Amino acid sequence: MFQATTIIAVRKGQQTAIAGDGQVTLGQNTIMKQNATKIRRLYEGKVIAGFAGAVADAFTLFAKFEEKLKQAGGNLSKAAVEIAREWRSDRILRRLEALLIVADAEKIFIVSGSGELIEPDDGIAAIGSGGAYALAAARALNAFSELNAREIAVESLKIASGICVYTNEQISVEVIEK
């Protein structure tokens, strides 16, 4: 659905990490930027979020989500439900072309433009053009290594960047510890 990036979230032990690559692609064939940051800290640093899709749309969604987070007193689940509900029902928001991954120390959610809200069973979620590759790599690394959440997120993005032409190895990471 949305190309030009990969975002992965991993929760393992006492650590939750979201990582994203830095590539910004114009159309199907032009790399415009190599070191963009697609991960942000929200709500006094207690929540981390990453986006895939149109940058302006993602910033609009970040602002809306942070507003919902403040209204919910930092309750990630409640804010995620509210932004998904608003996204689905608002005619302007429905046109936004972006996906979000949001996480705190306890939960991870994917919020989609169609108003879907998905909480992964295994504490690992990925979005973007390289999302399936990063997700598979992260699940394998989680099951068969002693790496922590941050290390799994970074290594899975490196693997995805070797497969997906819209993903690079200029990785930014944010981590929350319990």
Swiss-Prot record:
Regulation of activity: what does the record state? Allosterically activated by HslU binding.
Which SUPFAM superfamilies does the record associate with it? N-terminal nucleophile aminohydrolases (Ntn hydrolases)
Please provide, alphabetically and separated by semicolons, the GO molecular function terms listed in this UniProt record.
metal ion binding; threonine-type endopeptidase activity
Matching entries from PROSITE patterns are given as: PROTEASOME_BETA_2
Q: Which Gene3D superfamilies match?
A: Glutamine Phosphoribosylpyrophosphate, subunit 1, domain 1
What UniProt keywords are attached to this protein's entry? Allosteric enzyme, Cytoplasm, Hydrolase, Metal-binding, Protease, Sodium, Threonine protease
Q: Which domain of life is it from?
A: Bacteria
Q: Which InterPro entries match?
A: ATP-dep_Prtase_HsIV_su, Ntn_hydrolases_N, Proteasome_sua/b, Proteasome_suB-type
Q: What is its EC number?
A: 3.4.25.2
Q: Which GO terms describe its cellular component?
A: HslUV protease complex; proteasome core complex
Q: Name one GO biological process term.
A: proteolysis involved in protein catabolic process
**Reactions it catalyzes:** ATP-dependent cleavage of peptide bonds with broad specificity
Active-site residues, record numbering mapped to chain: 5
Annotated positions binding Na(+): 161, 164, 167
Q: Tell where it localizes.
A: Cytoplasm
State the family it belongs to: Belongs to the peptidase T1B family. HslV subfamily.
Q: Which NCBIfam families match?
A: ATP_dep_HslV (TIGR03692), PRK05456.1 (NF003964)
Record's function text: Protease subunit of a proteasome-like degradation complex believed to be a general protein degrading machinery.
Q: Which HAMAP family did the record assign?
A: HslV
Known partners and oligomeric status: A double ring-shaped homohexamer of HslV is capped on each side by a ring-shaped HslU homohexamer. The assembly of the HslU/HslV complex is dependent on binding of ATP.
| Protein name per Swiss-Prot or TrEMBL | ATP-dependent protease subunit HslV
Q: Which organism is it from?
A: Syntrophomonas wolfei subsp. wolfei (strain DSM 2245B / Goettingen)
